[in-house]
């Protein structure tokens, strides 16, 4: 099984935290890092990544022209489709390919997902599993029904068709432009269950996130955690800091709570990975080679031509 994440250098600490959790809980998985930078910084190497690959080194065309169209927010998502293709071509003996966002932490082996990928070419998780909060539902319609912080693809004709289609769309349109119906790589996947044989995975223990706290019961039994009775597999710590803590304040009771415990534990590990200094790392594609900063309006004008 191949697990990969895609980042710019300012997220190395998050990717390292993810990789640690993968190696601890899914030791048979290969953990691959796709890095959207001009060079690999020495600090990135360590025992948790099986390989670190620059996106530009496996890109089929002119990467500088492609990446010039994108902001740092868009960049690491814009390469995901092609990187799936690259991994499927490179690792011919592997049949399961999983993308995880860098701000995810794995708590146990992906038993159910392994089984699902034996029967389904595409496995995706929706943001919401229950109706009830109209603000959350509106947000989901704007940003994407499915959370692309996770995606599972099996080696199959259908899975490859989906990845090829997605990669082609991201090559042309992977922007943060909700007004035009685009939200990076994610909004495209609203169409995937219409076009392809995709499994909407409704196991509560996968892709649990701060936005899940409103409608999900989480409990601890001995040393294990359960979401609506399903064993916890991974948490997506999206919005670490203000956003996640606001969700906890608004939706959790005062006092002790299993999610608060998990959040505090994750933050300790995350911060121990040199988060304060790494998060300030400048993006190497933010400037011309002369050193001059590239204005966002220049990027937008370039993409429109």
Where would I find each of the regions flagged by the language model?
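Glycosyltransferase catalytic domains, chiefly GT-A lineage
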Residues: 1-305
């Amino acid at each position: 099984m191949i697990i990969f994440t895609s980042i710019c250098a300012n997220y190395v600490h998050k990717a390292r935290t993810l990789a640690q959790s993968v190696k601890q809980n899914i030791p048979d998985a290969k953990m691959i890092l796709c890095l959207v930078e001009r060079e690999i910084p020495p600090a990135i190497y360590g025992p948790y990544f099986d390989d670190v690959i620059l996106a530009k080194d496996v890109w089929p065309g002119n990467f500088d022209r492609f990446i010039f169209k994108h902001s740092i927010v868009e960049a690491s998502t814009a390469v995901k489709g092609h990187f799936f293709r690259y991994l499927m071509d490179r690792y011919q003996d592997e049949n399961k390919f999983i993308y995880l966002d860098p701000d995810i932490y794995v708590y146990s082996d992906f038993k159910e997902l392994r089984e699902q990928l034996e029967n389904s070419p595409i496995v995706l998780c929706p943001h919401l599993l229950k109706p009830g909060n109209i603000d959350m539902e509106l947000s989901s319609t704007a940003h994407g029904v499915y959370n692309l912080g996770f995606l599972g693809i099996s080696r199959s004709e259908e899975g490859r068709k989906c990845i090829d289609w997605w990669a082609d769309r991201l090559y042309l349109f992977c922007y943060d432009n909700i007004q035009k119906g685009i939200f990076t790589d994610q909004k495209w996947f609203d169409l995937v269950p219409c076009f392809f044989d995709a499994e909407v995975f409704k196991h509560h223990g996968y892709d649990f996130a701060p936005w899940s706290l409103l409608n999900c019961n989480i409990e601890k039994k001995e040393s294990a955690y359960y979401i609506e009775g399903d064993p916890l597999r991974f948490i997506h710590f999206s919005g670490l800091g203000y956003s996640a803590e606001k969700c906890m304040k608004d939706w959790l009771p005062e006092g002790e709570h299993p999610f608060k415990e998990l959040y505090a534990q994750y933050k300790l590990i995350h911060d121990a990975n040199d988060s304060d200094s790494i998060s300030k790392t400048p993006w190497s594609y933010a400037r011309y080679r002369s050193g001059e900063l590239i204005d966002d309006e220049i990027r937008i004008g370039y993409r429109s031509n």
